[in-house]
Amino acid sequence: IEQFFPGAGDYAGASRWAGLRPMTPSNVPLIGHTRYRNLFLNTGHGTLGWTLACGSGRAAADLIGRRTPEVEFPFL
């Protein structure tokens, strides 16, 4: 990295890091109630997390509030 960005920082203390994104093997997010009364899932969006955030959040709020989501989600 130093050869591409000389003088950009102190590389001596640098370490490798990866910001992994949770996703399911099928690439379909998990949104819905679980067998645990106080646990609701809205995860597994992978690289589309920000893209799907508003729609998934709204669907999650509807489901938690026992309302039918506006959009039909086949993966709920």
Which residue stretches match the model-derived regions?
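C-terminal catalytic lobe of FAD-dependent flavoproteins
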Residues: 2-76
